[in-house]
């Protein structure tokens, strides 16, 4: 399986969730994820030591479907800008490999950091 490239967009302070279907390298079908486990992290840059865990659920293993999500309680601490993430799959044998990687555009809106100075 080759590394699948998928860019995502995340809004600061909102719950992020996206479903992905992993296809075989030759495009002949989906990857059977039965018995696999997955993990994911997002960082400001590949060299940055600070990261946030991304939840990965294998939704339908025989159809290669996974879900990645980040709770709003975590995204509220993100800084706007470009970040990077990847998803590492572990085969039942213990062999680990990067299955998905990409950029994450983190958008901070006008309501992200609200300061109240009296009544509106």
Task: Locate predicted features.
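Contiguous segments within soluble domain cores/interaction surfaces
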Residues: 1-120
């Amino acid at each position: 399986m080759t590394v699948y490239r998928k860019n995502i967009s995340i809004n600061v302070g909102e719950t992020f969730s996206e479903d992905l279907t992993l296809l075989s390298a030759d495009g002949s079908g989906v990857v059977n994820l039965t018995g696999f486990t997955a993990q994911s992290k997002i960082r400001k840059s590949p060299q940055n030591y600070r990261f946030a865990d991304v939840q990965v659920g294998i939704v339908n293993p025989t159809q290669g479907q996974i879900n990645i999500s980040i709770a709003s309680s975590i995204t509220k601490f993100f800084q706007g800008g470009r970040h990077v993430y990847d998803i590492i799959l572990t085969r039942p044998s213990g062999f680990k490999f990067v299955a998905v990687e990409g950029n994450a555009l983190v958008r901070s809106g006008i309501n992200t950091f609200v300061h109240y100075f009296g009544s509106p």
